[in-house]
Amino acid sequence: MALDCLLLFLLASAVAAMEETLMDTRTATAELGWTANPASGWEEVSGYDENLNTIRTYQVCNVFEPNQNNWLLTTFINRRGAHRIYTEMRFTVRDCSSLPNVPGSCKETFNLYYYETDSVIATKKSAFWSEAPYLKVDTIAADESFSQVDFGGRLMKVNTEVRSFGPLTRNGFYLAFQDYGACMSLLSVRVFFKKCPSIVQNFAVFPETMTGAESTSLVIARGTCIPNAEEVDVPIKLYCNGDGEWMVPIGRCTCKPGYEPENSVACKACPAGTFKASQEAEGCSHCPSNSRSPSEASPICTCRTGYYRADFDPPEVACTSVPSGPRNVISIVNETSIILEWHPPRETGGRDDVTYNIICKKCRADRRSCSRCDDNVEFVPRQLGLTECRVSISSLWAHTPYTFDIQAINGVSSKSPFPPQHVSVNITTNQAAPSTVPIMHQVSATMRSITLSWPQPEQPNGIILDYEIRYYEKEHNEFNSSMARSQTNTARIDGLRPGMVYVVQVRARTVAGYGKFSGKMCFQTLTDDDYKSELREQLPLIAGSAAAGVVFVVSLVAISIVCSRKRAYSKEAAYSDKLQHYSTGRGSPGMKIYIDPFTYEDPNEAVREFAKEIDVSFVKIEEVIGAGEFGEVYKGRLKLPGKREIYVAIKTLKAGYSEKQRRDFLSEASIMGQFDHPNIIRLEGVVTKSRPVMIITEFMENGALDSFLRQNDGQFTVIQLVGMLRGIAAGMKYLSEMNYVHRDLAARNILVNSNLVCKVSDFGLSRYLQDDTSDPTYTSSLGGKIPVRWTAPEAIAYRKFTSASDVWSYGIVMWEVMSFGERPYWDMSNQDVINAIEQDYRLPPPMDCPAALHQLMLDCWQKDRNSRPRFAEIVNTLDKMIRNPASLKTVATITAVPSQPLLDRSIPDFTAFTTVDDWLSAIKMVQYRDSFLTAGFTSLQLVTQMTSEDLLRIGVTLAGHQKKILSSIHSMRVQMNQSPSVMA
């Protein structure tokens, strides 16, 4: 209250408190004691002012004597910090013309001077009388003078003049008045300075502020917000001008939340039951419905029990509650699909943002236990956040009981500690058509036909009667498609055009009808050139067959000769170093044998024999896509005469190469040119007759397999991953049958095209591993560099590379694929990897890896290389898995193979993490950081309470990412329960 009174006083006295007096002769009750010189000049007398008050004055009237120079000096005046001083003089002057017999030296003016000093330097005995030390302020002239008549009638014509001077810097000053022939009285002298008064403006207090040294000066005064007020935007300030007046303020203060303005000078606390949420609000408001403020100065009203306010609700909005459950559910079952419809909740909680979630549970026949539905179930328009009271659910299992919970939620459901209200409905699906075929593989192709195979649907839902194949040229559309049927999961499509790309789909049929067509996949028939090339490759087989007939006849003759002799002798057969083909004895066509290009005396001959020379004019280079050992790798186009233009990858040989580097570079083309398989990267040709030298291969849109998997973590099904592995194994089977050992089989050396077909590549590196000194993947061993993490132990120890060592590497590739590109053996050093393998430790199964696949990995990692499966056996095993997807349902665990010690990648110590950011970084899910924080999961304690529905709600939709995060949350929860202090 006292402060309020003070503020009111400051406002009321603002105008009156603008001048501070330093000296005023009107208040003197004794002699002023000023110094006059000469003594006959100025004289101090007592008199009366116009109001007949007694005053002390000085007068002088020596007008009858010429050459007057009368000085009057005040006492020392302390300036009290003022920079500019004002002097108010009240005086009377006799009109010279009213004086008889006055000489011409009579004056009606006088001069005002000042002298600035730090101390008293002039007294009556030691005064200085010269204009030199003084600074003249002005010559003072009377506006009115009086005559004898006025004097006789006692009419006092008093003049008042104000003069200012400055700036002053010393402690004080003297005033001096000079008379040089006037008849006058100095009635009073008031010396003062101006200042801007204390004031309250815009809820801020500004202190008294002296004016500046000049009349035009502006002095800044910083304001202080009154109690319970805060500055808004810029700091608040006022300018004090030379007249002691405040200028327009800059900035302002306003009452802070919980306080309202009172009389524009105070901020009063909001009473109980009211609130003020922001500085900008004018006054306190009553609490909205279902909320209260039990104490004063509340910035917000808290919700009553059972009511909540959403994060995005403003404070002035009423608190609301959660909705009741949906009503009157209707279900319509159609084979393995269902339509659910319902009525909105009877109580919406006072909100208009009610949405619905569908929780799907698949149950046993007796419904005693249920589990969440898998990710294959489809919801239209969606599973979570439905705005309409209707949903279509498909891809359910046939003849299976289901329970569906329909939850009603609104903007405050997440604030409630209780689960959302819901209504449940139990249904059982009927017989249904089979699910889709997951993938197709090309077995072979001719100019006029393509042979395909595929696994049966994951959910056959009965006995498969047959398959229907739909196909059409890619350049056309499905309205121009043709149909074919097959009783098995293999079909040969005839009557096709050479060199054309065909789009193919397949679907299965049961007694319930056809299932949906599979996804579209592209396959290509052979061109005329491809056919001729294949024919050339089979000529040795034809010649060999003819030779075999001759040999047979000769053999009969030889047998008769041998039988007629008592002894026979044998001699060693000589074989040509350049034997390229032989009949395998397994039927047509015969298998080619790989020829090492370095067995040629002239390696260029190998290039000419195995690689087709391409004119550089047929090649268009477009953009850099990488860098190889010998130069840059480009994406480009190849347009050969009579063929359509295709995308290609172009490896170039950098300038300044040596002849050895050129041979080494082209050796990869000599190797690649010998291979022809859908899962081996295809060589289009080489450019050697111009610069730069180029190796041209087919273009693989998705790049290296390891980085492709990391970019698509969790986005592929197990069947799709097994299909990729099957393609890699088929390519390696082909290489092993050609007696070619890859030596560097790894996911980084597998390329993926747009149809997810995986192809083995990088054939130049296997011979030159010892030349790579920069890549930490490769470690020195026996004078060379080998990729330790992918290499069989016998190859590390003795550099014994065989197809069996490639099988070991293939097992590592399997682990890379099933872990979506994780680094084998994680952050273990290469030496630690070698030691662990020598002690018979093997990699554990990746997360959610089927047990059958991990067992195949362990088979590939047998210490005895003769115990490892051959690539042909691996292909057969994977084909069985694809044909029987149920075999992939069992997930492997570390304890599943007690006879085989497995490396255990230790679970991170989650108790060491302090923030959600640290935890997400540790599990490599940092891309969801903003989603967690925005949704309010800002602490690890909150994270441990998350469910799969929470992950869906914040945007984690990939199944693999959900499983990875939920697994980590479970481990964190276990660790925190073991360390209760962490939960504090």
Swiss-Prot record:
GO cellular component: axon; cytoplasm; cytosol; dendrite; early endosome membrane; endoplasmic reticulum; filopodium tip; glutamatergic synapse
Function: Receptor tyrosine kinase which binds promiscuously transmembrane ephrin-B family ligands residing on adjacent cells, leading to contact-dependent bidirectional signaling into neighboring cells. The signaling pathway downstream of the receptor is referred to as forward signaling while the signaling pathway downstream of the ephrin ligand is referred to as reverse signaling. Cognate/functional ephrin ligands for this receptor include EFNB1, EFNB2 and EFNB3.
Assembly and binders: Heterotetramer upon binding of the ligand. The heterotetramer is composed of an ephrin dimer and a receptor dimer. Oligomerization is probably required to induce biological responses. Interacts with EPHB6; transphosphorylates EPHB6 to form an active signaling complex. Interacts with PICK1. Interacts (through Tyr-594) with NCK1 (via SH2 domain); activates the JUN cascade to regulate cell adhesion. The ligand-activated form interacts (through Tyr-928) with GRB7 and GRB10 (via SH2 domains). The ligand-activated form interacts (residues within the catalytic domain) with GRB2 (via SH2 domain).
GO MF term (any one): transmembrane-ephrin receptor activity
Post-translational modification note: Phosphorylated. Autophosphorylation is stimulated by the ligand EFNB1. Required for interaction with SH2 domain-containing interactors, for activation of the MAPK/ERK and JUN signaling cascades and for ubiquitination by CBL. Ubiquitinated; (EFNB1)ligand-induced poly- and/or multi-ubiquitination by CBL is regulated by SRC and leads to lysosomal degradation.
PDZ-binding (motif): residue ranges: 982-984
Residues in compartment: Extracellular: 18-540
Residues bearing the modification Phosphotyrosine: Y600, Y928
Signal peptide per UniProt: 1-17
Cytoplasmic side: 564-984
Protein's recorded name: Ephrin type-B receptor 1
The Fibronectin type-III domain, residue ranges: 322-432, 433-528
Deletion phenotype: Mice development is apparently normal. However, they display a dramatic reduction of ipsilateral retinal projection. Mice do not develop neuropathic algesia and physical dependence to morphine.
